[in-house]
Regions:
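Phosphate-binding loop of NTP-binding sites
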Residues: 3-190, 202
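Residue-level signal for inorganic ion chemistry
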Residues: 107, 128, 161, 261, ...
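ATP-dependent carboxylate-amine ligase
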Residues: 1-32, 48, 208, 220-227, ...
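A generic structural signal for short, well-ordered alpha-helical segments in conserved domains
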Residues: 65-69, 266, 367, 408
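Short, acidic/turn-prone active-site loops that include or flank metal/cofactor-
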Residues: 83-86, 129-133, 193-196, 331-334, ...
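Buried hydrophobic packing segments
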Residues: 68, 72, 91-95, 262-272, ...
């Protein structure tokens, strides 16, 4: 590594450590920011000599990255951005902090995938899903798929592990059609993780025709784009690998969606040569992920934290939550996106019949949505008020990003 890069890496580690010591955060952003100011090519230098996996998508990135890092860890030390800092500053900080490791598994914000592909030259890229998220400032889903596709076409040597159930992901992972409009066979390993949210993939990104669905299958009514046959699938409480062998998966994380994330992790690890029978044992070591799914006992209540930041992830959170009193917390600060109209894309009907409490900066926006959805609720001013308002036992907490962080801080829980 050049001298400038060595100095930048050292300063990055020092800045991150000082940030942690001063209680100003985990240092996962500031360290990388300073390092890249000293050497703009620092991420590329730190990536050299490592076998790297990138994990990107709208939802499930952090959990899948943690599961994948655990699975790849069978082979040796793995650098990873476990705090969820998923932009180049976070990647730089994570690699600088880890030092020399043979492997790295990095969560990548979907908007930065092309840039990080160029800098890191990964061995494999995992594409999870694409759906609407922070539309007041983020790109439309179809535009995001176009960016992914353009980036991947420039890196034909990179292995791709992609979700066969998401038409946008399949199109992005598939090479452009040839001159006679047939879609070229993709050089991709496909997994099936399901797709609960369909509202962003009814129109074919290739020709503009309608996407048709029947059971697990989907296809375009106007061109050859259709669901590919997945090599990795979820079956009951396990995962079926490309040989047809079934592996029981014992996770400490709730919800069927995390079984799909586990299938993705096993597929990515297999690209590094990890046998599923070895990798599956490591998946059960993952508990909470950057506070997600954490359970905290407070005043006789067992409080479980679930993060939901867009319509698709709210539906998944409802699936994970027990039939118990539930607190919903909504903010609209810069990291959340300022537009809360997406609340009307979420069907809150699954919450009927349980005690529902609401709080957060934009609790009244949420109140209007629940009123329209005929879901009774109680407004509380603080998280502490919510805890006192429910009987002893389980309290499910579903919150968007900054609301989630506020509640974590109140619980003094920093992972």
């Amino acid at each position: 590594m050049p001298l400038r890069a060595k100095v930048a890496s050292s300063v990055s580690r020092t800045a991150a450590a000082l940030s942690r010591a001063a209680g100003r955060g985990d240092g996962s952003v500031i360290g990388g920011w300073i390092g890249l100011k000293i050497d703009p090519d620092l991420l590329a230098h730190l990536s050299a000599g490592r076998a790297i996996a990138l994990v990107s998508g709208t939802n499930g990135k952090t959990t899948t990255t943690r599961l994948t890092a655990a699975a790849v860890g069978v082979l040796g030390r793995v650098a990873t951005n476990s705090f969820g800092a998923n932009m180049p500053t976070g990647h730089t900080s994570a690699l600088a902090k880890a030092g020399s490791t043979p492997y790295a598994v990095l969560e990548v914000d979907e908007h930065y995938l092309a840039q990080v592909l160029e800098a890191t030259e990964p061995h494999v890229v995992a594409l999870l899903n694409l759906s609407r998220d922070q539309l007041d400032r983020a790109k439309e889903v179809a535009m995001m798929a176009q960016l992914w596709r353009a980036a991947l076409v420039r890196h034909t040597d990179v292995r791709i592990v992609a979700n066969a159930d998401d038409p946008m992901v399949v199109w992005a992972a598939t090479p452009p059609p040839n001159h006679d409009h047939r879609i070229a066979p993709p050089q991709v390993t496909w997994f099936s993780a399901g797709q609960r949210w369909h509202d962003d993939s009814w129109v074919c990104p290739e020709c503009g025709s309608t996407i048709q669905r029947s059971g697990d299958q989907w296809w375009c009514s106007g061109c050859p784009l259709r669901r590919p046959e997945p090599q990795w699938t979820v079956e009951d409480d396990g995962v079926v690998d490309p040989t047809g062998a079934w592996h029981k998966v014992k996770l400490q994380l709730p919800g069927k969606v995390n079984l799909g994330n586990a299938a993705t992790a096993l597929a990515v690890a297999a690209e590094f040569g990890v046998r599923p029978v070895d990798a599956v044992l490591q998946l059960g070591t993952v508990t909470s992920v950057a506070g997600r799914y954490a359970q905290v006992d407070r005043d006789g209540r067992n409080i479980r934290l679930l993060l939901a930041k867009n319509p698709a992830s709210w539906l998944e959170a409802f699936d994970m939550a027990d039939e118990a009193p539930t607190l919903l917390s909504i903010n609209a600060r810069d990291p959340d996106g300022l537009d809360t109209s997406w609340l009307f894309d979420v069907d809150f009907a699954p919450l009927r019949g349980r005690q529902v409490l609401i709080t957060g900066d934009r609790a009244y926006d949420l109140a209007v949505r629940l009123e329209v959805n005929d879901v009774p609720f109680q407004h509380v001013r603080t998280f502490h008020d919510a805890v006192r308002a429910v009987p002893p036992g389980r309290l499910e907490v579903i919150a968007n990003y900054t609301a989630f962080q506020d509640i974590r801080a109140e619980l003094d829980r920093v992972n």
